[in-house]
Amino acid sequence: MIYLTLPYNTLATQEKLIIAHRGASGYLPEHTLESAVLAFAMKADFLELDVVMTRDEQLIVMHDLTLNATTNVDKIFPGRSGTNGKYLTMEFSLAEVKKLRVHERSNKRGSGPAFEGRFPYESLLFEVPTLEEILQLVNGFKQSHGRVMGLYIEIKGAEIHRQYNLDPAKKLLAILERYDYREASDPIWIQSFDAEVLKTMRQKHKTRLKLLQLIGENRWGLSATDFDYLKTKVGLNEVAGYADGIGPWMNQVVTGKNISGDLKLTGIVTMAHHFNLKVHPYTMRVDRLPDYAETFEDLLHIFFNLVQVDGIITDYPDRAVKFLEKTADH
């Protein structure tokens, strides 16, 4: 464990990325076109989004493999849920998904919003976008504003998709090729918690796009990937063979403070940088601060100026952009 205290002006801010988590999701329901528009207006460098497939092999933008938590699917298609009461995206056509309306994310009980004080939970103003609609939106921004917002796309649930004979990674690469995303220099990252998905994209599909290995906890059951191994020096060296960066959970970077008030760091950022891997931790929220940060700006200072990460994923891109602008002014 590493203990660290450093002054506020330790690090220059150039090339630090602000990645808007599911759009400007602190202000509007996640994964909607409107949330993406707001993220662009807030000057986010990248738009983070998750993709899953429908029954008719269309990529839609949604975090979960089920429709329950963010749509009114139970009202529009009663009786269509599986034995566990879940509505899998792979069991619905795109036309059916387009009949749904998106609301603020539900809590795990489905009894109210996951985050109090955000956009009204009962509002049903929004719909589920397709990946291509997001791509067209970003292209439109480039033409009308002359500014590019990059894309930061996560492939969800490869194992479950395989059970339905669906291959979201292959479909994703084909769509991106049509929209001229081909090279490592293009403004796009593809991310996954599943190491095999990324290895297949790099080794079988020969993609040159930037890939990022997300790192979770083994107890989360996200994939067969051994995250404990990936957090080691040997594991990160292996990641560097197929990916360009890592996305650790922020609590895997900073674990708290010691009795003297110094930050306790795991050292994963230093190790990753040794292997030329970029580090973009997730997810920084104004309304979910860790114990070691008194304010959101304090949290940003810790990760940008002390830990020296290369970018952060946040529900509040405007606050992060303003922080970097203010730091640059000094």
Feature names for model-found ranges:
Residues 3-330:
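Phosphate-group recognition and catalysis centered on beta-loop-alpha active-site segments
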